[in-house]
């Protein structure tokens, strides 16, 4: 009996170390950034069992077998659709401004299509304006409405959107609603899913979360896009979730969330439509490719319209596209670069690009909220401040609530607006969407909004920052080490 227990003990020890060695080898064999690999190895060696479970759950980007098969199966038809779209030569821009050309060239070569012209574009900077405009557009819808959001939380003006959407479905408009399971958990626990389905709306819970799915796909892979499409002509996207900030996270102690959305009319709705169609097919297996733009029924404002490129990221889309786009935009800056983000945990490459821009004379400003709803991100982001300040970057801490807008403005001409935070999760993992706009008129509108943010912010003083307590520095460095995993 003693020999039996001895053998079992030795086998357990051998299996334990074999498991650690196997996971270590897997981490080293994966093509990932060195800081990310080192962070995972440290967790596994300090807390082996917890670290291994965490790595298998969150350490690798896998969509799940069923969704991966759907993503693979949809691309032949999607490629044919893109080929047909290219035949609509009248919607594509033939030239871009000097500052925007490198980014538009990158997008064309990696995504297969150029930016589309002839769009009307309106920047909405308050939730009230956005939701009221959305209700009006829903009431005018005749054919189809598609929506995808990370968070849909009932309450306030959001309920008016829900009622107008159900009314549209009852009068025969084909309505589809795709919501992230984790972000919209309160919605799926409310009466609204049943009410909407009874009204005729297709409601889909994306990337469902439960303990039994932990080892089937990465659980922190989220559907983070915010898109509304109406009649394949009107479109919305930006940073705003389907929430009324007067009722959302009021106990978080960060104030109301501040967002921006872009409302568009024109052929850009078609390019956003193909992104939505891909998401819908990956989640449901149903194919809903949008019709190509029809010049006979869709008015094109070629002389005054905006040129817009759509960048989509996530499993099944071009790898590192968002990251490459941001790097290209930063390196294109010659005079001014302004960035707003709620979560600032950049990659080493992006941090280096921002600092280099400031060091070569570009006026660089970053606007972040003073208070944050994520303690880990709050401390991790501050670990980058010293390097940014030393490079000459101006850091503004917004004091009027949780600044949730995500925007980049380069030389007053090139704008990026969408759902992407400047953190690892948005850059490498989630389903995200970003608009790239080459237009000085829209740039002026965005600059006005950013100036308003700056007016409601406090400029971080480098001397005072260097006098912060030692325990602050230690905490920042601790969370900085785990920043590749945030």
From Swiss-Prot:
Keyword Transmembrane helix applies: yes
Enzyme Commission number: 2.7.8.-
Chief location bin: membrane
Taxonomic path: Bacteria, Pseudomonadati, Pseudomonadota, Gammaproteobacteria, Enterobacterales
UniProt cross-references to Gene3D superfamilies, sorted A to Z: Endonuclease Chain A (3.30.870.10)
KW Protein transport (keyword) present: no
Protein name: Cardiolipin synthase A
Membrane topology label: Multi-pass membrane protein
């Amino acid at each position: 009996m003693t020999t039996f227990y001895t053998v079992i003990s030795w086998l357990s020890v051998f299996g334990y170390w074999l498991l650690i060695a196997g996971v270590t080898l897997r981490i080293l064999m994966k093509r990932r950034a060195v800081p990310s690999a080192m962070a995972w190895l440290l967790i596994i060696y300090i807390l082996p069992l917890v670290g291994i479970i965490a790595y298998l759950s969150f350490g690798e980007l896998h969509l799940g077998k069923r969704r991966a098969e759907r993503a693979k199966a949809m691309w032949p038809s999607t490629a044919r659709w893109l080929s047909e779209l290219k035949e609509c030569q009248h919607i594509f821009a033939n030239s871009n401004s000097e500052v925007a050309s490198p980014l538009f060239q990158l997008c064309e070569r990696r995504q297969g299509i150029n930016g589309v012209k002839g769009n009307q574009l309106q920047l909405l900077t308050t939730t009230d304006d956005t939701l009221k405009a959305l209700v009006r557009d829903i009431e005018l819808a005749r054919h189809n409405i598609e929506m995808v959001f990370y968070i849909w939380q009932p309450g306030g003006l959001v309920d008016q959107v829900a009622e107008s959407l159900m009314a549209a479905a009852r009068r025969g408009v084909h309505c589809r609603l795709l919501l992230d399971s984790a972000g919209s958990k309160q919605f799926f626990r409310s009466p609204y899913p049943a009410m909407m389905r009874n009204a005729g709306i297709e409601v889909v819970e994306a990337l469902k979360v439960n303990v039994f799915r932990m080892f089937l796909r990465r659980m922190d892979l989220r559907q983070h896009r915010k898109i509304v499409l109406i009649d394949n002509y009107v479109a919305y996207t930006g940073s705003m979730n389907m929430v009324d900030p007067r009722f959302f996270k009021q106990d978080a102690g960060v104030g109301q969330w501040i967002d921006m959305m872009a409302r568009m009319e024109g052929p850009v709705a078609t390019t956003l439509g193909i992104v939505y169609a891909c998401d819908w097919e990956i989640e449901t297996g149903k194919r809903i490719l949008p019709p190509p733009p029809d010049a006979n029924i869709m008015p094109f404002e070629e002389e005054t319209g905006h040129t817009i490129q759509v960048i989509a990221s996530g499993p099944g889309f071009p790898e590192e596209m968002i990251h490459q786009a941001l790097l290209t935009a930063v390196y294109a800056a010659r005079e001014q670069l302004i960035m707003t983000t709620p979560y600032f945990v950049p990659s080493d490459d992006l941090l280096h690009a921002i600092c280099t821009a400031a060091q070569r004379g570009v006026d660089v400003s970053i606007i972040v909220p003073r208070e944050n709803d994520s303690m880990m991100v709050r401390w991790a982001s501050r670990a980058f401040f010293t390097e940014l300040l030393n490079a000459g970057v101006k850091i503004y801490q917004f004091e009027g609530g949780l600044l949730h807008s995500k925007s980049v403005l380069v030389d007053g001409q090139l704008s990026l607006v969408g759902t992407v935070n400047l953190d690892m999760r948005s850059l490498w993992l989630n389903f995200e969407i970003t608009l790239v706009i080459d237009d000085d008129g829209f740039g002026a509108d965005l600059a006005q909004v950013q100036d308003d943010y700056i007016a409601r912010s406090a400029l971080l003083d480098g001397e005072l920052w260097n006098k912060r307590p030692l325990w602050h520095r230690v905490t920042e460095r601790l969370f900085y080490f785990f920043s590749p995993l945030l």
